[in-house]
Structures are given as structure tokens and as C-alpha cells.
Amino acid sequence: MFNYPLYIYRQDVKSKLMVTNSDFNFTIKETVTLELPFSEHIEELKQRLFHTFWIILILTFISLCEVKLLVKILELPVNNVKFFQLSPGEYFVSTVKISFYTGFLFGSPFAIGQIILFLLPGLTKKETKIILPLLLSSLGLFGFGLVFSYYALIPAALNFFLNYSDEVIEPLWSFDQYFEFILVLFYSTGLAFQIPIIQILLGLLNIISAKQMLAAWRYIILVSTIIGAILTPSTDPLTQLLLSIAILMLYFSGVGILFLIKN
């Protein structure tokens, strides 16, 4: 009698079959390759980018239709100031920029969702438990940064400049420059609020531990002051102080969260 294995490889299912008769014993192994071709990954990525582009474009168009309401919202943090335009098309260009950034902002959750759906099939359960909460937390922290900037940093900076020039000159501000000022403060604060996410990533990759982060608190105070000065478009000390305090609170919150994750 002959008894020897015969191996056959296929790409549909994984199984192991035994075929037996009176004379021969055959061992048939079938393997599977479930990975999609690279071209299909690229095609899926193109579709998700295309959908994201159209969502942002639609939200931008809706924002442009309601741009007067958005302008009034942006003007709320400051009182007793008259805005003007330096050129005939300045206000129009400003409203287009406001509409685009608003559409991009409200389209960000959809974009994050598309990224998650694209990455999800290729992630392990362990990676999914780490990456998904970090992406959602990053989006939430960015939103908190915008809220903190709108209700705390922007009024503090604008009131400082108004009080400094009070009874000396009449405040007449270019709306385009005012919008650029707010935009820089918005996004710099939103980026500063990503500090805990960076800390958690560094800790999970074992690049630096939570104890080492905590031990460097003296240097962090200095660094937070420098970052606050760099990210703040104004030169007033109050705005820089508020942003520096926020950075410190975020840093120590990141250390605490990393301690909880590791332990």
C-alpha cells in the first residue's frame, strides 16, 4: 500500500480533507488568501475621498447660503467695533473662506468616519481598541479647543486690545484681518488640544513612560509658555497665559490617562 500526502493550494477556503479508498490515502490541504488586491484598496480609497469631498462641498454651499449668520456669530466675541472692507471684493472673499472652513469643520466627523471604515478591515482587535478611541478623542479634543478659543481666548485677546486703545483711537477693524486673527487662534488652540493624544501614543509605543513625563514637569512649564507665545497670534500676556494654562492642564491630563491605561 502507498501512503503519501498530496498538497493542493486554492484561494477560496481553508480546510483539510482526507480522501481514503482501499489502496490510497490522500491528504488534501486547501489554503485561503482573503486579502484584496492593491488596486481594489486604491479604488476604495478614491471612493471614500470622493464622498468626503462632496460632503464638504455641500456643507460649504450651505454655509455660504447662511454666511450672514456665521458672520454675526464671529462678531459676537467683540463689542463696540465697526468693521469695514479695504477693497470692493474683500468681504466676498472673506465670506467664501468662512464658508469653506465651516464646511471643512463640520465635514471632519464624516472624514474621520471614512478613515475608520477604510482602516477597520485591516486592523486587529487590539489595534482597533487603540486606534478608534484615539481618532474619536482627537476629534472631540479639537472641538473642545475651538469652544475654549471662542469663549475664552478670543474675548480675552480682543478686550485687551480694545482696553489698551480706549479713549485714544476709535476701533475700526478690517473684517478680513479680524477673520484671519480668529482663524489662526481657532486652529492653533485645536492643535494644542491634541497634546494628550500625542502623549498616549508615545506611551503606548513605549517611547516614553508616564513617570518620565511627570518627572519633566519643570521643563513642561517652560515649554508650555513658549508654545503659548508661538501659537497665540496676539502679543497680549493674558491670552498667552490662558493658552499656557490650558496646555499644562492637557499635559497632566494626558499623563493621568496614560497611567490608567498602563495600569
UniProtKB/Swiss-Prot annotation:
Q: Which InterPro entries match?
A: Sec-indep_translocase_CS, TatC
Some GO term, biological process aspect, for this entry: which one?
intracellular protein transmembrane transport
The record describes its membrane topology as: Multi-pass membrane protein
Q: Does the keyword Coiled coil apply?
A: no
Q: Which UniProt keywords apply?
A: Chloroplast, Membrane, Plastid, Transmembrane, Transmembrane helix
Which GO MF term does the entry hold, naming one? proton motive force dependent protein transmembrane transporter activity
Family stated for the protein in its record: Belongs to the TatC family.
In its UniProt entry, what is this protein called? Uncharacterized tatC-like protein ycf43
What are the leading ranks of the lineage? Eukaryota, Sar, Stramenopiles, Ochrophyta, Bacillariophyta
